[in-house]
Amino acid sequence: MVDKEIIKRDEIDILNDACFKSLFRSVEARGMISRFLSAVTGINKERFLNAEYIGGELIKGKLSERGKIADIIIKLDEEDETCIVEMNKYDTGDIIEKNLSYAYSVFNEKTRRGIRKWPKVILINIDNFNRFNADEPIIELEMRDKNNKYNVDLVKVYHIVLDNFDNLNYNIDKEIAKFVEFIKTSKFSELKKISRGDNDYMAGYRKVEDLSTDPEFIGYYDYEQAHQDDIEMAEYTGLKKGIEQGIEQGIEQNKKEMIINMVNEGLELDIISKITKLSIDEIKKISNN
């Protein structure tokens, strides 16, 4: 077994894809998540507390989730509403359009199955960038006529622009502001201060703390952090189109370095194999070079 003290750390990036999904889908953090979603959408918090969060927590051995089309899909009660939540760490050029296609895919799937009433789909984008060059911390989009008199609310889209929550010109809902502060904070000492005195947030804090000492999760977290940053930043800067081969070589080198670091930190070879999809023999070969 791997000694938890070996991998214990003082901070963690909650915006990391693996961490965000695990936190958002967890039963432990359901209270703080429901309060946030309710404040954004105006939907009663109890409905989010009792909703079905498709995919559940990340399953050991199946962490890559290659078949998933969205970060979190929440099936609300008999009202036949679905809420999709997407963490967008980088603007890769088409990320917003791609997420919108997810929302319409869910809508189309529901209409094909035969319906008693038209379904509603809510898409919440948590953006770590400002695609619209907006000042507002929260942007709400829906289908309206050009005179802004009539609207169709079957598909509604929200953008939570993280960078704009420091803008004091807007009266930001306290529940949304607190959640944004939490997910933007990486140091455990600060996360604990934010959560202190709030049972829902303390439960969320403890979940993140538990994740940070899970050997398999943290190995995947580190690998995903390095791998995704390389890929997404390459797309973001436009390098991918011009020098794909060089990027692939860089990612491959980064992958090798991550494997060597995992071995040096004492992570078990079978766990590294699950994370990287490489055989134990391949891992040994890389770590011995």
Identify the residue ranges that each predicted region occupies.
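Upstream accessory/linker segments immediately N-terminal to the RecA-like ATPase cores of bacterial MutS
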Residues: L154-N169, E175-K178, F182-K193
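Short, solvent-exposed coil/turn linker segments
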Residues: N44, G55, D145, V161-N164, ...
